[in-house]
Structure formats: structure tokens, C-alpha cells
Amino acid sequence: MKKVFGQTVRDLKREVNKKVLKVPGVEQKVLDATSNEPWGPHGSLLADLAQASRNYHEYQLIMVVIWKRLSDTGKNWRHVYKALTVLEYMVGHGSERVIDEIRERAYQISTLSDFQYIDSGGRDQGSNVRKKSQSLVALVNDKERIAEVRQKAAANRDKYRSSAPGGMYKPSGGYGDKYDYGSRDEERSSYGREREYGYRDDDRNSRDGDRHSRDSEDRYGRDGNRDDDYRGRSRSVDNYGSRGRSSEREREDDGHSSSRGSGARADDNSQDGRGGLQRKFSEQNIGAPPSYEEAVSDSRSPVYSERDGGETPQVTAPGAASPPPPQVAAPEAASPPTGTNTANTTATFVNESPSQKVETFDEFDPRSAFSAGPPAYASTDGVTAPPTVTSMSAPTTSNSVEMDLLGSLADVFSSNALAIVPADSIYVETNGQANAGPAPSFSTSQPSTQSFDDPFGDSPFKAFTSTDTDSTPQQNFGASFQPPPPAFTSEVSHPDTAHNFGFGDSFSAVANPDPASQNVQPPSNSPGFPQEQFATSQSGIDILAGILPPSGPPVQSGPSIPTSQFPPSGNNMYEGFHSQPPVSTAPNLPGQTPFGQAVQPYNMVPHSQNMTGAMPFNSGGFMHQPGSQTPYSTPSGPAGQFMAHQGHGMPPSHGPQRTQSGPVTLQGNNNVMGDMFSQATPNSLTSSSSHPDLTPLTGAIEIVPPPQKKFEPKSSVWADTLSRGLVNFNISGSKTNPLADIGVDFEAINRREKRLEKQTNTPATSTINMGKAMGSGTGLGRSGATAMRPPPNPMTGSGMPMGGGMGVGSYGGMNQNQPMGMGMGAGMNQNQPMGMGMGPGMNMNMNMGGYGQGYPMQPQNPGMVPSPNMPGNNYNPMMGQGGYNPQQSYGGGYR
């Protein structure tokens, strides 16, 4: 009784206070809902508070009380717990403002997770508060859960409302002040619809207010309408993704045929002429996929159809747009065999199909180009026009280099032969690089009037033999390793030689514009080395090719090289080499290849080619050197022997030397040199460095990198070179050339001179044949001088470069050449060290005129190439030091 009486007294007291203090009804409800009674807040109070929260004025009153309750502690833990319960209910059923405010004050609620209170009975009542605060914070931070809770609440409201007799939902409650503190209009102010949470009596102007004010009130009554209004408004403002009316509709349709199901929603949708679509858009999650209805309506939307490309907002607009896809084939049309300009095509695309895809395709040049491409080929009007790739963006005028690269091989046998090269090209002489193993294709290459115009200077494997070409050379051709035979191929015509330095020729397919110039290589001589000539004036290309050494001079199968080709015993060095290569191919590396060295991709040989033409050493520059075997000058005899050696066609670098065997027989002079040469057999340069012999040709500074020969031997030669510290890899060649050109090598020359002076005594002592070979060319031009050591000229020293000086540097072999200033050349790489070394670049020959030849084996191709010119004469001067040469071999051994 006591408890009951106490409860009654408290109720009366509250009632009195309300009347006396005039406490607002909403506030009173909040106080009752969060009272310290042992029971939880009544459902009717929660519903009233949730609904009142949609009125900004009442909302403020509610929240003030709640936040005050949350600050209670101790024995008033129920205030806290119930306040949390009210907030949790309002998150699902009330205004969205509540959610925002709870987030703002989340820190305050989080502190309640530490709430502690143990009642007199020893029970931990604080745990209730802790759990509730944690769950509320988690809910507010989880948008998905909020959306679920609010949707469920909306569904429940529909059930209650539809079950009411008049479609009205009157929450039960004992308070008569439900509407005392806010008019319907005031309450209608919607959270999220009003920019400021102002108290607006004119809220009726808002969309929802206006809609509901029309006739909903008559149908549903004030309360029902208001609740509906809240619900609709809150949902439309709801960012939490009320899955919309769909769930509500399902529940409505599933059993409640109330006027609400038939009327309220339909009426709302039709009220302002706003379709259900509008409501749907507002109510549906932005990120959610469109519903079927929306998708359909979108298709009918004028905006959509226009965007799709249709000019009229017809439902079929999308279909109209779709036709363009077929035009995806338009590229074919775009590239008619005639190569019609794509501009037209583009226009058609635009007109016919607004479809974005089509337009995009239209602008996609690569695709257009490809489709057009075939027509371009097809449309050869009897005139072999370069296959033009018509691209949407540009006329078909451009040749397709890319296509050339791949297509050339495929089309080698085709009549058009890709027509990539202007038909007017002079003629192509297939000059298989003697070494190129793959060359078969070359030999097969059918004569084609067209020459290859390859910007890169090395045509794809396919080399077209011009009908003009000497067939014999082609046969010998065999296979060339290098895909870009053109480089060697180009006959370096005499005219070209000067430019090419010989290197250029050897590397690039220097197209001698003149077939005549190519005559330099008599086909008869060429037989061993067919030459490929690209009529296409590739002079420009030559330069490039010159820079890049071919994979290696073709190794000819030691073709019988009639040195006779070059009577030039006279030219000794230059011609000699040439003849030795037997190649009229002189222009082409092939010629030199005869010497085993050809392998070296030395470009020198090519240079020598040029020389053959009697080109002065200069022009040949290094080129001559390659030929520079001349010391042998016994062209035919020696040549033949060398040729045999050349059989090896060692790969570049020293390999050639291995040929060492030397049919030293070469003529008397050649003896020493002969041996060396035979070893050097590879390209003249490769052929063991020039012979010390290089007698007379001091003027022609031939750089003899014969040292490469040494590299060839895998065993003894390598041992020597390594022991001497002369290990030079062709790689270094390029470095050398630049320095030599600059004249940086003088220091090296000085050092070498000193060393050479000491060693000059040991001319042909070289343990290695190479050494001999180099030595053999004692004099510059001197074919006879057996030992390089006796270098008649400073140049003589050059001879040793190859071997490290004739005998002296023999050990130098490949590298030895370096020893001398002229050794520069000898050093292969070292040569560069020398001023001349630069020139040697390629061969190193540059150094000493005659002996330079020896260097060729050196084939620094890489480095040398650049210096090619210098070598020639420049070096001689440098070489000037005659005596050193032999010694150079040692001193030079190291740059």
C-alpha cells in the first residue's frame, strides 16, 4: 500500500506542477517517458514524441529534456537509461534531425559506456546504461541499420493506420495536449526540407504541405494526414535509403484493402501532376539500381532519348541509336579499296548513329587505319604504291613503317613486295652478308625492282634482289645473320665511301644511289659475297647503319676470292685487303669476310670496300684498313688463303683470330703477315691486325685491330691478352672512338711510345699468330716488310697495333694493338685511347695507316665506327711515332 500510495502522490504532484507551471505538453511527455519509475517508457508516449519531433519547436523541447536526463548519475540511472531508449526509438520513428543531433553528441553518449551504479541489492544497474549507450552509438554510425529500422517502422505505421476504421491513426494517450504546442502547419515543417530549422507557419508552401492540404485532410482526418505527411516527407528526405514505397506497398497490398491502399498513395502521386516517378526518385537510394518502372520511364524520357542520340523523344529512340552499331563495320566502308578519305566516313557515322560508341570508334584511328590498310594494298593501281594506311585522322599518304617491318618478310614473295618502297628505287642488289647465317632468305629473295626504304637503315630480312643484281653473289649469299643485310649490303659505292668512312657502308645498307658505283664489286668477285644494294637512296640511312655495327660481317665460306679483283697490290693496304676479301664486295663487309674475321661485325671491312674502289685510304678510312691486308698485296694468293680462314666468320670481335691457321703462304711479304692474316682471316681488319707490313701506306692510316684475332682463340690467345691486361671487349670500341676523335688519346700514345720504344726490339716475337699477322704488315704499305717491328714508319707501329705491334704486340693480339698510340687501334678498344684510336673506332686501323689493317680484327665496330674517318689519316700523324709501333704492342697493350 505504501508503494501504491507514494506513486499516486507523485502523479498528483506532477499534474499540479504541469498545471501551475504550465509545462508544455511535449516536455511533460518526455519527463514521463524518462521518469524514474521501474517500468519503461510507454509505447504511446514514444509514438507521440517521435511524431512531435517533426515539429522543430517541439523537437527542441524534447531534446533539451533528453540531454538533461542523460547527465544524471547514480541512483537516477533510470533517467539515463530511459532517455537512451527514447533516442533509440526516435532514430527509427522520428525526424532525421534526431539522428544528426545524436551524431553530434555521440561523444557525450559514449561517455556513458563507463556508467557505474550498483544498487543496494548489489546488482550492477550501470550495465544497462552501458549497453544501451554502446548500442545507440553503433546504430547511429551505421547508415544501413538506420535505413532498415526506419523502413520497418514505416511498415508498422501503415499497418496501424490501415487497420483504423477511418484510415486514421490516433495514438492512444491520456494527454489532451498533443496538439497544444504546434499547429498542423508548424508540425509539418520537415527536417531536411527547410534550410533552417525555422518555425514556419507557411510551410504549406512546401511541396508536401501543398499536396496534403488539398484533399488528404478530408479523407484521412487531421491526424492521419499529418502522420502521412510526416512519413512521406521524412522518407523523401531520408538519405538512409528507405527502400521505398515498394516495401510499404507490399504490406499494404497484402491484406489491407483500406482506403489508404487505394487512395492515399495514388492520390499523392497524382496530386501535383508529379508522377510516381518523382516520389520514387526522392525516396530511392541514389546508389541503388533503378527499378523496372524507372528504367522504362527513362527510356521514354525526352532527355534520355535525346542524349541517346535520337532527335525525337520517342520511346524507340534507343532503338534508333542502336542501328549505328552495325556501322561499327563502317571502318570497312571507311576504308574502301580506293582508300577513300576517312573524313567522309566520319560524317556518315555522325549522321547515322549518334551512338557514343560509334562515334568513339569513329575517332579511334588505329582501328580505322587497320581496316583501311588492306584496301590500300589492294588498291595498287598498277603502280606499286606504298601500302598506305588510311587513318581516320589523316590521309592515306603515309607509308607505314611499322607495316613494313613485319609485312616485308611476309611479302617478300608477293608481287607487290609491300610496295612500301617507292617503285622508283634504283635497284637492290642482294648482298648477303657473308656471315649472316639466316641469309637464306636473302638468297631466296626474289629480284624486285623495288628497293627497301627502311628508315632504320637495315631492312627486314627480306632483301629484294634487284633484277639488276648479280645473281652469283646472291647465291653465295647463303644466309646472313643479320636481318638488316642492307647495312652490309649496301655496296658502299665509291661516292658513298667518303661519307661512310667505310663503316657506314658496312653497317648500313648504303644505297649507292648509283648502281654504277656499286660496280665496285665485280659480281665475279662478289660471288662469295653477294651484295645487296638498295636502290632507295639510303645514303641517309647509311649514316645510321654505319653507327650500328651489323651483327657481324658475314663469314664467307672462304669464297675463292680472286684477289685479282683488286690488282691493287699497288694499293697494298687498301686494295690488298680488298682483294683479299676477294670481294668486290669490298664495299660490303662480305668482301672482307673472306678473312675469318668477317665475323667481326667490323664495319671496317665495309670500309675497305669503299677503298677497293681505289678510294683513298681516307675515304675508306678504316674501311681500307680492313682491306689493308694489302701488305700482302699479293692479292690473289694471299686472298685465297685468307678466304679460307674467313671460313670461320667468327662472330665479331676476336673470334676471327682463331682462324689463325695461317696459310701464311701468302707471298713473301705476307709470310709473317700471311700467317697473321690467315689467322686474322676475318675481315681484313680482323685479319690479324694489319701486317706490320703496312709499308708504304702510311698515308692511309689503317687501323689494324687484328688483335681481335687474339680474342678469337679461346685458350692461348685469351691467356695472353688477359695476362697482358689487354682484355678488350668490342664493347669498349665505341668509347675509344669518341676519345680518339677528340684527340684525348694522345696521352695513351705517349705512354705507349715509351713502352714501345723498349719493346721495339721484339717485332714479330708475338707468340700469337695474330701478332705475326699484324707484324707481317711491317710497313704501312709495305707488303714485304715481314715484321711489323721494323715499321718503316711511325705508322709501322700501327701494324703492331693489331698484334700489339707486329711481332711485338703479337701477344697483344687483339687487344695488343692498343699498346701503341697507334696501338690505339691495336688495342681494339685501346686504339681509341690513341688519338687515332678514335678513328680506329671501327677498326682501330685508323691508327697506323698500313698496319692499321691488322686492327680490323679488333672490330671495335661499336666504338670505332664513329671515328672511322679520323682513323685514316688522322692517325697516321699520330702514329707518327713509327718506332713505337712494334712496341706499342706492349705498351699499347693497355691503352
Swiss-Prot record:
Bias category Basic and acidic residues: which stretches? 150-161, 177-236, 245-257
Q: Which InterPro entries match?
A: ENTH, ENTH_VHS
Disordered as annotated region, ranges: 150-396, 436-533, 758-784
Listed GO biological process terms: endocytosis; protein transport
Q: Where is the composition biased (Polar residues)?
A: 349-358, 387-396, 464-479, 515-533, 759-769
Listed name of the protein: Clathrin interactor EPSIN 2
**Which species is this record about?**
Arabidopsis thaliana (Mouse-ear cress)
Which SMART domains does the record cross-reference, listed alphabetically? ENTH
Positions occupied by motif Clathrin binding: 409-413
